[in-house]
């Protein structure tokens, strides 16, 4: 994030934490966007018109969270210089914003890892114990494998059941 221009979608508590980290990491410029303009934020329309050169976009808003998972806070097509997207939402695992980023070959990170990291630090604090940082990746990997599924589509008698039975044996 050093020397990058960052667009932050949302202006609540999570946005304030993101701003503090970006400032510590040497972010060149931070733009805060929300639905309605305030003294400290701009609107979606202003972001697209005046700040299309943002290199990193961070979604701290609930836009795109289940049950409104078909929403996204911004259209990445308006930001041709975007290099990375961070979406703090963890449900769904892949928000529409992250899906769009991946289709555009833009690096993207979702919110599940952050949620697990928060839980790790909460356990350490309340249990007065120290856990290895590697537990974060272990838990994220386990959760991802539990939440993902395989969908087989095809005409009748094309082998979906046979493939499903074979997959079930290998995956269980």
Where are these regions (language model features)?
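Conserved lysine of the Walker
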Residues: 160
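Rossmann-like adenosine-cofactor binding region
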Residues: 40-109
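Hydrophobic positions on the alpha1 helix immediately C-terminal to the Walker A/P-loop
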Residues: 163
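Adenosine-phosphate binding glycine-rich loop
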Residues: 3, 88-148
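NAD(P)-binding Rossmann-fold cofactor-contacting core
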Residues: 24-42
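Glycine-rich adenosine-cofactor-binding loop
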Residues: 1-23, 154-156
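Post-Walker A helix-loop "phosphate-sensing" segment adjacent to the P-loop in P-loop NTPases
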Residues: 170-172
């Amino acid at each position: 994030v050093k020397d990058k221009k960052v667009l932050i979608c949302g202006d609540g508590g999570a946005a304030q934490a993101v701003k503090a980290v970006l400032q510590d990491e040497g972010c060149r410029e931070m733009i805060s966007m929300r639905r309605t303009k305030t003294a400290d934020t701009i609107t979606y329309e202003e972001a697209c018109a005046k700040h299309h050169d943002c290199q990193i976009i961070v979604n701290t808003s609930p836009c795109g969270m289940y049950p409104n998972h078909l929403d996204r806070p911004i259209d990445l097509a308006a930001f041709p210089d975007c290099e990375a997207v961070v979406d703090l939402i963890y449900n769904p695992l892949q928000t529409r914003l992250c899906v769009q980023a991946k289709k555009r070959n833009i690096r993207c990170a979702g919110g599940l890892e952050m949620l697990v990291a928060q839980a790790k630090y909460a356990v350490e604090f309340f249990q007065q114990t120290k856990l290895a940082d590697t537990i974060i990746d272990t838990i994220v990997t386990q959760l991802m494998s539990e939440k993902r599924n395989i969908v087989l589509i095809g005409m009748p008698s094309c082998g979906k059941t046979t493939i499903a039975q074979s997959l079930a044996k290998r995956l269980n």
